[in-house]
Amino acid sequence: MFDEYSVKALLEAGADVNLKTTEENTALGEILGYMKDNYFDFNKIPLIEELLKLLLKSGLKINDTIDKKGNTAFIKACESINRNKLSNGKTLAAVVAKFLLKENCDANSTNLDGQTALMFLCASHGGEAQDLQIQVLEAGADIEAMDKNGETPLMYAARNRNLNIGKEMAELLFDFGDPKLEHVNNEGKSALEIATDLNNEEFVKFLLTKM
């Protein structure tokens, strides 16, 4: 997989780097598809970065959607950040996400469900997700964004399965502004009520200090 020479040959022959399949997938989406590959290893990361640079040089539209759900590559990478961690804790998704951020991708793009990259990161766990959350917030991610269910990044953090990381994600949101603590979703529940329902005591205690 990841045949750099073939990619170069195709691009030199005039291949459309933004061409989509019937499933709305693109070349960039195919790279992200290897997140399911259990044989992907750390040594291939430099090759991935070179391929991404090649695609970008050939006119890659980094903010284009890559699937029928309306996800951009950046959203998809952040949504998949926990998959197939390498022995050093790195993930292919994080490699792609960080590359796209460096190239000034739209940190506030939404999919068809109104979800942003920040929302997915707030629901994720592990050091890579936390590191990316900081970078996304520094890139101007909207901490008040709402998905089609009226859920905010703070609510995604409240649902984080790793209770400690969820709380840390919430703390970062408050560091960057007002994540709408009093807001309720389409079911009439606030982040505080969601955390209470999930018996997330530390998260509840933290939110109470912000009221």
Description of each model-found segment:
Residues M1-D3, E30-L47, K76-A93, F120-A129, ...:
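Ankyrin repeat A-helix N-terminal signature
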Residues T26, T72, T116-M119, T152-M155:
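Threonine-centered tandem repeat motifs in low-complexity domains
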Residues E79, K90-A94, D106-A139, K148-G150:
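Eukaryotic tandem repeat interaction scaffolds
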Residues K8-D16, L52-K61, K98-D106, I134-D142, ...:
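Ankyrin repeat domain, specifically the short helix-to-loop turn at the C-terminus of the second helix
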Residues T21, I66-D67, N111, D147, ...:
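Ankyrin repeat boundary/linker residues
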Residues K8, N25, G29-Y39, N43, ...:
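Intrinsically disordered, low-complexity regulatory segments in ankyrin-centric signaling systems
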Residues N186-K189, I194-M211:
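Ankyrin-repeat-protein effector appendages
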